[in-house]
Amino acid sequence: MHHFDYSGGRLHCEEVPLQRIADEVGTPAYIYSERTLRRHVRVFEEAFQSIPHLTCYAVKANSNVNILRRFSEWGTGFEIVSGGELFRVLKAAGSASKVIFDGPGKTAAEIRFALESDILFLNVESGAEADLIIETARRLGTKARISIRTNPNVDPKTHPYISTGMKKHKFGVGISEARELYLRLKNIPEIELVGVTCHMGSQITQMGPFVEALASIGALIGDLKSNGIPLQYLDFGGGLGITYNGEEPPSPSCYAGAIIDATKNLGMTVVLEPGRVIVGNAGILLSRVVVRKSQGDKHFVIIDAGMNDLIRPPLYGSHHNIW
């Protein structure tokens, strides 16, 4: 945890004692370090500075409007998965020009909202969704910029609850289906094909899956180009993990190096969707002990926060340190 330290037996964030915050605003409360957020954005940007790229922070990782506002000030774009997240981004940034919209269940109303807000592009996850986008764009008299989320069927070697890039998952379409969909949409007047997208999951701590997926996507890009479909953006999603309990994920520079090597000759802008790697260790849940109790040989410490405030441990047994 950067900028969270003990001094005089008290936990501080950026030299501010958390006891003071608890006394002034109460608990439970989320406390974030702006210095940590700024540092992580800077490190990520510097890692990719040698190639054309756009960093689109994954809003799902933390949708606090004040955090989104800071990211906008620092020049990042945003990856969203709902109309509600788009609403938050517009409140924070005032523009959707650097917004990309993911998710297999976009509604007609959300697609309309996205097109009216002039987002950068929509990531299409099925042929049926493509038809809904065409219909919505036609009604609005506009053109939809789209990328197709392509499933490379690579095992990301992460927890099955947060794996998204294999055949058994609901996200995206397979390589061959993606090719057919690009060819079908090529001459649709309401559609502008601008990119190809791949996202394999979250909390990935090995480079192998990323490299394997890039090889598959690179072959598809070459195939499409030979069929008269040049693309501007390669959206490689997010998923880079962080350390919770001894994991050793690749550093941003190592991650960037593999992506740069695989994409530098494609002539495309690489879009990145970092989420937890930016915000994961930039904040804490500040809580207060309410009561202690024992039942048999079990001892409980009851606090004023619940699983709704920090759901990962009860949902799938993830580890979080207690400070």
Specify the residue positions occupied by each region the protein language model found:
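Short beta-strand segments
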Residues: 58, 145-151, 197-199, 235-237, ...
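Glycine-rich beta-strand-to-loop/alpha-helix junction loops that act as flexible
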Residues: 200-201, 234-243, 274-276
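Charged (often Lys/Glu-rich) extended helix/loop segments that serve as interaction or gating elements
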Residues: 258, 267-323
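Conserved anion-binding
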Residues: 116-117, 126-192
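Short glycine/threonine-rich loop-to-helix capping motif typified by GTGT followed
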Residues: 206-212, 243-255, 281-291
